[in-house]
Amino acid sequence: MIKKVKASLSEKIIFIFLITLGIFSLTSFLILKNKCLFVKNYDPKKIKFDNPENIAVLNVSCGNVIIELYPKVSPKSVERFKTLLRSNAYDDSAFHRVIEKKLVQAGDLEFGKKNNLDYGKIGTGKSGLGTINSELGGDFKYTRGSVGLARSFKNNTEDSQFFIILKDEPLFEGEYTPVGKVIYGLEVLEKIKYLRNTEYILRPD
């Protein structure tokens, strides 16, 4: 006669632990495999904007990033940004600089295109339109989501490259030309550093 063996308390605890560990491991794997899993993708066609002419949409792997531009703050810089957007110049432009939890930068139209990357020069390219003068924004506050034009170490060297900050940066105020602020989809940018697709992470800091 076969006797039914009862599991001891310690065996039950081990069994429950292994099951829990398995579920946790599977969940972690699925999340790591798809970093966009919990990121909301905003459809600009379903959002009513007060001034649609001052709205820019960036298409990133995890979804759309919607930016409100501020022509009253930096008129010439915003016009340059709009000109490049209208001509689709930013299409296939890689995020070549990513500082985790601080900022992402893109817009190198000469060396930073995904289909024509130059790893030795990326970040130094131009648009072909020439540089423009800095517009340092007066009382503009560089709070989380603000968008500014990148430049060299000197003022009046802004061109096509832009950055978006992921945290408040008061030290940027009066130093970099602001062009707008992300109003939807900032969480999309926070996922860039973790994507395995290297077209988005070329020289992470």
What role is predicted for each listed range?
Residues 1-205:
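Cyclophilin-like peptidyl-prolyl cis-trans isomerases
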